Amino acid sequence: YPDVVWLDEVLPGQACTTQRIMNAIPDPDKSILVTACDNAVLYDANKFMSLVNDVNNDIIVWSYRNNYTTYYDPEKYSWLELDGDKVTKVNVKEFKGGDPLDQHAIVGTMFFRNKRVYLKSLAGLYERNSTTNGEFYIDNLLNDAIDLGYNVKNFEVEHYICWGTPDDLETYKYWQRFFDQVDWHPYDYKTDYFTN
């Protein structure tokens, strides 16, 4: 894998790690999709591409609602404040109230129009020295992007599947087995990408 970026050290957060990858991308105009590895989503690809194709959108943040992974400990998640589909503020690991099932939590997937948008927002994050739990999160960087005047849009996915904790993974496996055993659901364990 010649394009893999190897790190010899632990960096102080995902925003710093992603910066290393950005530095390895030669084309400053290339769009970038950053995502977490501990979840899956079902989403409308056409709806997402319509947001991507609108060149006025600088950043697209994937979010979800109505998922009980956030209900019992909402302080583990980052939350969007919205004006329509425009992101006006991100509350990182800080829940501002209301019912967590009704609020937009961040999936961990973000589209950046190009690496300049990311790096300029990151510079603001570093300048403010804005960390959460001692780490530089990409979620924090979104507030810098908003302050810089970038157009940050929300993209709500249809369904969020969390594997972030051992309990989340066991819950996922339970539902895999359940849906595989009932006749009325199309799920087939033998053809599931994640089981083969």
Regions found by a protein language model. Name each.
Residues 1-82:
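Conserved beta-loop-beta/alpha segment of the NTase-like Rossmann-fold superfamily
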Residues 5-8, 12, 109, 160-163:
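Short N-terminal micro-motifs specific to bacterial/archaeal maturation
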Residues 192-196:
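Domain-scale signature associated with acetyltransferase and cell-envelope carbohydrate enzymes
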Residues 86-161, 167-170, 174-190:
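Catalytic-core segments of class I nucleotidyltransferases/pyrophosphorylases
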